[in-house]
């Protein structure tokens, strides 16, 4: 069995900390980078919300949605256009930034302007990609593949630590259940924490996806995002990943499972209350 990263890990992303016994932190932003103006608008709104709630927040968005259902699906503004936008968000807003990488050759360049490199779920076993991300020294957030058991992620994390990087987050985003459906097994959250030794993130929006559910695009059931997010926080996680958009019904990707930006603050406020209760010390209720 692979050795976990540590018994009680804390991973810092700028001023934001992720730990199983630390207050909840949030990773949030639109599915894809649609334009510089759109990214800065959403990032600015999220920064204001995080300040009001006093919650740690990492901004996320993707420069390329390489894994689209259809070849005609919008993919984002692309790597070269996105790099200066990532830099602007970090410098002008002071927010740490996360984005996903799809090829080993992208890692070093992207790492110059972001704080977290994310490994997509479908690529979580790609050894060259994991090693290239590890070599940057940046925090690596690796999503558990929909096809993997939670205990299988020990081998994935071992590849990253074997590459000399112990700054790792592990994200649960559901498991394939028949056709066009994902389910969230809440047992996976403590199993991931125990097996990998890394702080665990729950991806509340991708967990309600219906992959390929609309034929040429992915469907989703965003009404269940708060339900699953509350359940995960009650079980105990280091953070929650939430994709949000000012107008998700007209977003170029993942609209059916994104949370409307106007609903984001109330959702996070409630999750913080659940988190405080879940992590409160109570000697009468041992784990």
From Swiss-Prot:
It comes from the Bacteria. Its EC number is 2.5.1.55. One of its GO terms (cellular component) is cytoplasm. Its main location: cytoplasm. Gene3D superfamilies: Aldolase class I. It is found in: Cytoplasm. Keywords: Cytoplasm, Lipopolysaccharide biosynthesis, Transferase. One of its GO terms (biological process) is keto-3-deoxy-D-manno-octulosonic acid biosynthetic process. Signal peptide: none annotated. Transmembrane segments: none annotated. It catalyses: D-arabinose 5-phosphate + phosphoenolpyruvate + H2O = 3-deoxy-alpha-D-manno-2-octulosonate-8-phosphate + phosphate. The keyword Magnesium does not apply. Pathway: Carbohydrate biosynthesis; 3-deoxy-D-manno-octulosonate biosynthesis; 3-deoxy-D-manno-octulosonate from D-ribulose 5-phosphate: step 2/3; Bacterial outer membrane biogenesis; lipopolysaccharide biosynthesis. GO terms for molecular function: 3-deoxy-8-phosphooctulonate synthase activity. Belongs to the KdsA family. NCBIfam families: KDO8P_synth (TIGR01362), PRK05198.1 (NF003543). This is 2-dehydro-3-deoxyphosphooctonate aldolase. It comes from Nitrobacter winogradskyi (strain ATCC 25391 / DSM 10237 / CIP 104748 / NCIMB 11846 / Nb-255).
């Amino acid at each position: 069995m692979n050795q976990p990263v540590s018994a009680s890990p804390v991973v810092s992303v700028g001023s934001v900390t992720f730990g199983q016994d630390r207050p909840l932190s949030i990773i949030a932003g639109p599915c894809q980078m649609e334009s510089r103006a759109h990214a800065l608008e959403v990032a600015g709104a999220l920064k204001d919300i995080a300040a009001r709630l006093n919650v740690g927040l990492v901004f996320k968005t993707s420069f390329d949605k390489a894994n689209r259902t259809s070849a005609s699906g919008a993919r984002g503004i692309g790597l070269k256009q996105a790099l200066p936008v990532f830099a602007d968000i970090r410098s002008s807003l002071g927010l740490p930034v996360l984005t996903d990488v799809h090829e080993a050759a992208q890692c070093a360049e992207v790492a110059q302007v972001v704080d977290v490199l994310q490994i997509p779920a479908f690529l979580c076993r790609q050894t060259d990609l994991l090693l290239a991300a590890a070599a940057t020294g940046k925090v690596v957030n690796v999503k558990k593949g929909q096809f993997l058991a939670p205990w299988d992620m020990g081998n994935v994390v071992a590849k990253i630590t074997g590459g000399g990087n112990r700054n790792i987050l592990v994200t649960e985003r559901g498991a394939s259940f028949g056709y066009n459906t994902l389910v969230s097994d809440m047992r996976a959250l403590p199993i991931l924490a125990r097996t990998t030794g890394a702080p665990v993130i729950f991806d509340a929006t991708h967990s309600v996806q219906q992959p390929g559910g609309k034929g040429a695009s992915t469907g989703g059931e965003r009404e269940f995002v708060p339900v699953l997010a509350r359940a995960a926080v009650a079980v105990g996680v280091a953070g929650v990943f939430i994709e949000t958009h000012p107008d998700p019904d007209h977003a170029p990707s993942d609209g059916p499972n994104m949370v409307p930006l106007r609903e984001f603050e109330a959702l996070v406020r409630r999750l913080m209350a659940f988190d405080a209760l879940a992590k409160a010390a109570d000697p009468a209720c041992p784990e």
